[in-house]
Amino acid sequence: MSTTSSHSNVVGVHYRVGKKIGEGSFGMLFQGVNLINNQPIALKFESRKSEVPQLRDEYLTYKLLMGLPGIPSVYYYGQEGMYNLLVMDLLGPSLEDLFDYCGRRFSPKTVAMIAKQMITRIQSVHERHFIYRDIKPDNFLIGFPGSKTENVIYAVDFGMAKQYRDPKTHVHRPYNEHKSLSGTARYMSINTHLGREQSRRDDLESMGHVFMYFLRGSLPWQGLKAATNKQKYEKIGEKKQVTPLKELCEGYPKEFLQYMIYARNLGYEEAPDYDYLRSLFDSLLLRINETDDGKYDWTLLNNGKGWQYSAAKQHVVQRRHTQGTNNRRQSTIPPYARTRQNLLSSPSKQTPVNNVVDASVATQKDGIPGKAASPQVQQQQQTSSAQQQQPQRVEQPAPQTTQPTQVDTQQAAKPAPSKEKSRKKFHLRLLSCCISKQE
């Protein structure tokens, strides 16, 4: 049963919905506030008609992992009208976002500090009997801006996580082959490309690919072309196999090569030595006369003002450009058309100021003013947005030729313009939330 109020825009009894800050294959993401303690929250909406619903499984996984450092808390799961709703902690930007702000290169010091946190995060997940299976920069976020945890790296989006052993008996899942591809092709392990059952070693290898991506700016298997997605994934896997680790890590601190060699030589059921892996990056910091002081590249931007200043500055430029474009478009429309267009686009006076979705997509056809537009419209918006964004994960049997649900399509050096726009909007809204909270 829906608990949404058409006047106060409250869901789940005491969660007020604010501005939309993102969307993807899962659905839509909004910022909001817990009316009991005034805590900022994130609300994820997923169509109940989704062919592959994920929010319920994600909620259950979060509940099993809750309490671990770097794992966001979840507060509510339920149904709101035509949507499933998950309420959780509101966090900051992803490592992919911060990578863009830093010119698509991180310093060895920053990558070493990131590596230590990511290793610890994945170790915690493994100790709860899960493997992540979709390691990528987009799935690791820093804490809420201005909070005590603003530089803590959080692991999010456990839609593809899987138990690798029985939590009661601790018996490991048996080794299998001819498995489906699960993960993001750019970062997945060689064994995953070969259709082998994933285990803890595959998470570690994927992390190594992420570390080298941060250092290099791109990976050798990006930008490969093929007639079909299946052929493209095969090409990516082949390129990974024929690229020597020395060549992949050439010109960068030796500790990254040592990490990759260790990860690729782990056995299927072998327990990783996480302490050893962290010690590699402690040694690196010591060798380059640095310390793990929490001063990441993104905190040093703009003479120490940080990434927030870049986000706000870029949004002002984007907003001016958008306003200029809209004005030029209006000048080309006949007066009668402009009048009719404005009438059609103007929200009803009965529509609340803060809608569950933007006013431009809220309609009276949905029954209650302020409710989301029809699931069909939202599904089309989600699909078009997901296709334009960063490398997307694959979950498809390797021998089949059917179209995967998500494709690794991002060009490494130049992100797609649509992705840039959505990211800038995200950061402005996040900043406005921070400012209003401080006031």
Curated annotation (Swiss-Prot):
Catalyzed chemical reaction(s): L-seryl-[protein] + ATP = O-phospho-L-seryl-[protein] + ADP + H(+); L-threonyl-[protein] + ATP = O-phospho-L-threonyl-[protein] + ADP + H(+)
InterPro entries: CK1_Ser-Thr_kinase, Kinase-like_dom_sf, Prot_kinase_dom, Protein_kinase_ATP_BS, Ser/Thr_kinase_AS
Positions with biased composition (Low complexity): 372-413
Gene Ontology CC entries for this record: cell division site; cell periphery; cell tip; cytoplasm; nucleus
Enzyme class: transferase
SUPFAM superfamilies for the chain: Protein kinase-like (PK-like)
Keywords per UniProt: ATP-binding, Cytoplasm, Kinase, Nucleotide-binding, Serine/threonine-protein kinase, Transferase
Keyword Transferase: yes
Pfam families associated with the record: Pkinase
This protein's name: Casein kinase I homolog 3
